[in-house]
Design a protein with these regions (language model features):
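Transmembrane beta-strand segments of Gram-negative outer membrane beta-barrel proteins
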Residues: 17-39
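Long, well-ordered hydrophobic secondary-structure segments characteristic of membrane-embedded
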Residues: 34, 51-65, 72-74
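Surface-exposed strand-loop-strand hairpins of Gram-negative outer-membrane beta-barrel proteins
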Residues: 33-53
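Gram-negative bacterial Sec-dependent N-terminal signal peptides
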Residues: 1-6
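A general structural signal for short secondary-structure junctions and capping/turn motifs
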Residues: 16-20, 61, 269, 334
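N-terminal basic/disordered segments at the start of proteins
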Residues: 7-19
Length: 484
């Protein structure tokens, strides 16, 4: 049974076990994952189950062309994500209460408005201050009576300190009130913009792999293999709710794109004692993807950012380079008694160097972080590499029936984690059974239960926005094989 659930975006585990089967061999299978992942946002609201069920098929064909040369074609879906929030929480749009800006950002807007009001006041002449004070009292300065009152008040302003203080205080208060109204309008407009979005936060990522493997056995029991990998990737993300602040309403659609990479490895086998050992390296694969991005209206409402956001929105988007990670698989198997084998798999995936920063998202993040250096941030990234271990025992019960039990552990890819996949690693326990109606055919099935690691969920800027605990998943797998 394939991995089904793992750190970051890992899914299939990228096994090449089918290629190391003796003779000619074909298999096809499917895995189904039913996760239950829920938590609370920082306001104490329940998120409900945000993890979507998904299934992914796999297939493999291995041909023993000569005694020393073999060829394999493997299909799998190595990476992916499927998640969506619903209900009433900070990851779902609320058309009444959503706020586009953090309390700190709102404070900055009001402070900036008041600073501008103070600067304008400081540059006013005595005549302008007196005129502003009288107009605030309803005096019409275009009339003769108004001009007389203006002259008398200006004389008093210039010759009486108490009157000067009184007028200055009133004019500055009026300027601050006007500035506060303007700042409030900015905040209100930003809130209106994000409240126009609908639905909950969602993410979907799909990949497909075709591996073309050529093997050479230069000496008995040893196989060297290498080949090319063709991969496609597509996906989309929608950010909704207060948790995402100015990015509430952001959408990105990644069109399907293709890339190529390679794999290489070596295997050592002694069939007489059911011994197998193999190590496989898979390269990273670059994808230059076209991305459609929308939803920057909240930040545009801030006067200091309007021009920059308009320029970003109007400019053609650069292609997004997505690099799926390199990995290493170590597979071990050995007979430990008659009709009984022990097996283990160790997998490393280089998630620490993986990130996604769409062009416009990245530019907007640089504008949003201008006050702190303007370095911006990624839409998705991970802080650690993934390590996973699966080990178990299989036993042939009769000529037609066999079974196995296994236990697994996954390190996760760091904590805090993205709100789009808020778990950190797992432990699992699995059982499987295989029925062979003929020596050349079999049907195998299995089930695994996952205890998912607790995690704090953060948004792209690094702010923790939720806590996810006591989650689990169950996976099912079915596979059929044929030797010919």
């Amino acid at each position: 049974m394939t991995v089904a659930f793992a750190a970051a975006l890992d899914r299939s585990g990228q096994s090449i076990a089918a290629f190391l089967q003796p003779g000619n061999y074909f298999e096809a299978g499917i895995s189904v994952l039913d996760p239950d992942v829920s938590g609370k946002d920082t306001s104490g609201n329940n998120t409900g189950d945000m993890a979507g069920d998904y299934y992914f098929p796999g297939a493999a064909l291995k041909l023993q062309l000569t005694d020393k040369i073999s060829f394999g074609l493997l299909y799998d879906q190595p990476f992916g994500a499927d998640a969506g929030y619903s209900g009433k929480n900070n990851f779902v749009t609320n058309s009444v209460t959503d706020r586009a800006l953090t309390a700190g950002q709102e404070t900055e807007i009001f402070a900036g408005a008041q600073a501008r009001a103070q600067a304008i006041f400081n540059n006013l002449t005595a005549q302008e201050r007196v005129g502003a004070a009288l107009r605030a009292q309803g005096v019409d300065l275009s009339t003769q009576a108004g001009q007389v009152q203006f002259a008398n008040t200006l004389n008093a302003y210039n010759n009486s300190a108490p009157i000067k203080t009184q007028i200055d205080t009133a004019v500055l208060a009026g300027a601050n009130a006007q500035a506060n109204n303007q700042a409030q309008n900015i905040v209100n407009q930003a809130n209106t913009n994000v409240r126009a979005a609908t639905g909950g936060t969602q993410v979907e990522v799909d990949t497909q792999n075709l591996s073309f493997i050529f093997g050479l056995s230069p000496i008995k029991n040893v196989t060297l293999y290498a080949g090319g990998v063709y991969q496609t990737i597509e996906g989309g993300v929608s950010l909704r709710g207060n948790a995402y602040s100015i990015y509430n309403g952001y959408d990105a659609k990644i069109k399907e794109t293709k890339g190529t990479g390679w794999l290489a490895g070596a295997a050592y086998q002694i069939p007489e004692i059911a011994l197998k050992a193999s190590v496989t390296y898979r390269s990273e694969i670059d994808h230059d993807a076209n991305v459609t991005e929308t939803g920057f209206s909240a930040l545009r409402a801030i006067p200091t950012a309007t021009a920059a956001i308009d320029a970003i929105a109007a400019a053609p988007a650069e292609k997004l380079t997505i690099t799926t990670p390199q990995s290493v698989n170590l597979d071990l198997q050995s007979g430990i008694m008659a009709d009984t084998v022990a097996f283990a798999n160790i997998r490393w995936v280089n998630w620490k160097d993986f990130s996604i920063r769409p062009d416009k998202f990245g530019q907007v993040s640089e504008v949003a972080t201008a006050a702190s250096g303007g370095n911006g941030f990624n839409l998705i990234n991970y802080t650690d590499d993934q390590w996973s271990v699966n080990a178990g025992v299989g036993r042939k019960v009769t000529d037609k029936w066999a079974g196995n039990v296994s236990v697994g552990w996954d390190s996760g890819a760091g904590n805090p984690v993205s709100t789009l996949g808020p778990t950190e690693g797992y432990w699992n326990l699995g059982v499987g059974v295989q029925y062979s109606p003929t020596p050349a055919t079999f049907i195998a099935g299995g089930v695994k239960y996952f205890w998912l690691g607790d995690a704090d969920a953060n948004v792209s800027s690094g702010t923790v926005v939720g806590e996810f605990e006591d989650n689990n998943a169950i996976a099912y797998g079915l596979k059929m094989g044929y030797r010919f």
